[in-house]
């Protein structure tokens, strides 16, 4: 019985230590990004990308974690005003937490505030230059604004980081075709 308690205690301490360091600065990300680049197929790549997202979503700040969870739930429920209030508080409370900026960027995009979304994506990328989700979002915004060359660049950067990023290849193909047709 004592041995079982020690094992449970060890697992709890290890999990707490992993969570305490989790965010875009987590050392596990370097290994995961290397594994993502070497993934053999989309299934393996998707699994690794999911682990990266899990780490990006972690924060050691309990209040920040609560605001993030509430903001995501409100955004998913299309209560955008409430989500914006929570994400605004979150980026003030945790200004170096990349996923806080990325989630607010996503919300601002959904609210048609493209300039605000781009600003938050830029901040996300300052904090985590490998954020393939933010790069993909930037590509979508640039496509919507008719900035095809900038969109193409963003999608290519995202795909370099995550070769299995859903939709990026199709967007690249469409943008390259559109740019070729313009050149004619």
Where are these regions (language model features)?
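Residue-level signature of tetratricopeptide-repeat
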Residues: 70, 104-105, 138, 145, ...
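Terminal, low-structured helical/coil segments at or just beyond the last alpha-helical repeat
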Residues: 27, 38, 47, 54-58, ...
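Register position in tetratricopeptide repeats
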Residues: 76, 110-111, 144-145, 174-181
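Alpha-helical adaptor scaffolds
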Residues: 64-133
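N-terminal leader/linker segments that initiate helical-solenoid repeat arrays
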Residues: 2, 18-69
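Bacterial N-terminal signal peptides
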Residues: 8-15
